[in-house]
């Protein structure tokens, strides 16, 4: 049986939630492998709308859902999200949900530090969600983190607290903040420990068993390749690797488990927060894309920046992440445009580039080279086969496929799960 890894091929917010939900109904396990509760997914199932930030999308369908070791976990955010979903009738228990016991925790002072840094940065801020993701990853890499398994040993936490407070109290002092209240922190952890430990286990072992049984595993990425700590628009990136290879290291399975890599890309481009955006439209066209696409962040509610499809960026994302096929989403947002543009290259100080440069100053300076196509005025909303699409919409899909040098495997034409045109089944490979 084939496994499938779903990743964002742009700056996140590509519609991964709908695609993962669609695939999860055919998977035996769904795994989150990086990020934290900074990655919002909106799922629409019938009349019910589910907003997830931390839990794998498979939880809504009752599929075994796993938070892998590559995720940083806010235990209080976890409890809030589970409580909300249970209120919507979703069943969550230790049989269908598991957390890696070696996950690093996001703690209250991580959120504090995130907010303090963003405020101090002023106009130079990164645009984080302020949820402590970056500082938690810093502590993980710095070997200071408190992990899920430590919640079962809170009476022996002193050495870790010494390392944590020595680091963070110095940072807090620089911002004029008081030291961490160790007693309160331990009390808060005692209060939440049993709740988290109910789901904690060596998930690599459970996944090994699932894989050995020939079951289908769906790896659910968060954010997008252009926010990858190495391959993204550094420093305007997230704090983890978002490329497909992280599915292996972030879950406890080897690289052979990654399977079919399905990249998700909107039929246009959006970005939330700061950072370079070559095709950004700050005119009526950009506003129209945002309004038609309802472009507001699931987690922050921030308005997303909008622009034309950038084939250079998506082609690069596909290359560095080994994308097997693309799911093109929100095609219906382009309905009604007389002319549609696609970025096919860049100009940078008199030179033509067919790739996105690494240096921040170069990224900010590139000018898009556009190819124009006729648009279409018929509706694509709800289309479920190529026969339902206008001829120009099909030409657009084909041209995108040529430019990104990667096959289009799926086309999504609305937030509804069934409104999907399947060209190549990821699970059949």
Curated annotation (Swiss-Prot):
Its cofactor is Mg(2+). Mg(2+) binds at residues 13, 40. GO terms for molecular function: adenylosuccinate synthase activity; GTP binding; magnesium ion binding. It is found in: Cytoplasm. Plays an important role in the de novo pathway of purine nucleotide biosynthesis. Catalyzes the first committed step in the biosynthesis of AMP from IMP. Pfam families: Adenylsucc_synt. Homodimer. Pathway: Purine metabolism; AMP biosynthesis via de novo pathway; AMP from IMP: step 1/2. PANTHER family: ADENYLOSUCCINATE SYNTHETASE. GO terms for cellular component: cytoplasm. It catalyses: IMP + L-aspartate + GTP = N(6)-(1,2-dicarboxyethyl)-AMP + GDP + phosphate + 2 H(+). NCBIfam families: PRK01117.1, purA. This is Adenylosuccinate synthetase. GTP binds at residues 12-18, 40-42, 304, 330-332, 412-414. Its EC number is 6.3.4.4. Belongs to the adenylosuccinate synthetase family. IMP binds at residues 13-16, 38-41, 129, 143, 223, 238, 302. The active site is at residues 13, 41. Keywords: Cytoplasm, GTP-binding, Ligase, Magnesium, Metal-binding, Nucleotide-binding, Purine biosynthesis. Binds 1 Mg(2+) ion per subunit.
């Amino acid at each position: 049986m084939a496994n499938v890894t779903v990743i964002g091929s742009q700056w996140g917010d590509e519609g991964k939630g709908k695609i993962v939900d669609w695939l999860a109904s055919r998977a035996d396990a769904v795994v989150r492998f990086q990020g934290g509760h900074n990655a919002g997914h909106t799922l629409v199932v019938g009349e019910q709308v589910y907003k997830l930030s931390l839990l794998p999308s498979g939880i809504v369908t009752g599929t075994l859902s796993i938070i892998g070791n590559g995720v940083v976990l806010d235990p209080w955010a976890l409890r809030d999200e589970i409580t909300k979903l249970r209120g919507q009738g979703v069943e969550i228990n230790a049989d269908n949900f598991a957390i890696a016991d070696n996950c690093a925790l996001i703690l209250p002072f991580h959120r504090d530090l995130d907010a303090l840094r963003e405020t101090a940065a002023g106009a130079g801020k990164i645009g984080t969600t302020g949820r402590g993701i970056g500082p938690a990853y810093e502590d993980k890499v710095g070997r200071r983190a408190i992990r899920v398994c430590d919640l079962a040993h809170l009476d022996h936490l002193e050495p870790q607290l010494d390392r944590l407070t020595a680091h963070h109290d110095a940072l807090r002092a620089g911002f004029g903040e008081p030291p961490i209240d160790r007693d309160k922190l331990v009390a808060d952890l005692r209060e939440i420990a049993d709740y988290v430990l109910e789901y904690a286990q060596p998930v690599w072992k459970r996944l090994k068993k699932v894989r050995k049984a020939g079951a289908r595993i769906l790896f659910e990425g968060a954010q997008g390749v252009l926010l990858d700590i190495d391959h993204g628009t550094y420093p305007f990136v997230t704090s983890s690797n978002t490329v497909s290879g992280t599915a292996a290291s972030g879950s406890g399975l080897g690289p052979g488990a990654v399977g079919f890599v399905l990249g998700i890309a909107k039929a246009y481009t959006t970005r939330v927060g700061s950072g370079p955006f070559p095709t950004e439209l700050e005119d009526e066209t950009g506003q129209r894309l945002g309004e038609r696409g309802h472009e507001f962040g699931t987690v922050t509610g921030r308005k997303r920046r909008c622009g034309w499809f950038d084939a250079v960026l998506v082609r690069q994302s596909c290359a560095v992440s080994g994308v097997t096929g693309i799911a093109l989403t929100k095609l219906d947002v382009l309905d009604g445009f007389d002319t549609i543009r696609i970025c096919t290259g860049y100009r940078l100080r008199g030179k033509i580039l067919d790739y996105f440069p690494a240096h921040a100053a170069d990224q900010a300076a590139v000018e898009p080279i556009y190819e124009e196509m006729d648009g279409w005025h018929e509706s694509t909303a709800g289309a479920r086969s190529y026969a339902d699409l206008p001829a120009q919409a099909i030409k657009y899909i084909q041209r995108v496929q040529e430019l990104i040098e990667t096959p289009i495997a799926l086309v999504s034409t609305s937030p509804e799960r069934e409104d999907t045109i399947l060209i190549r089944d990821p699970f059949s490979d």
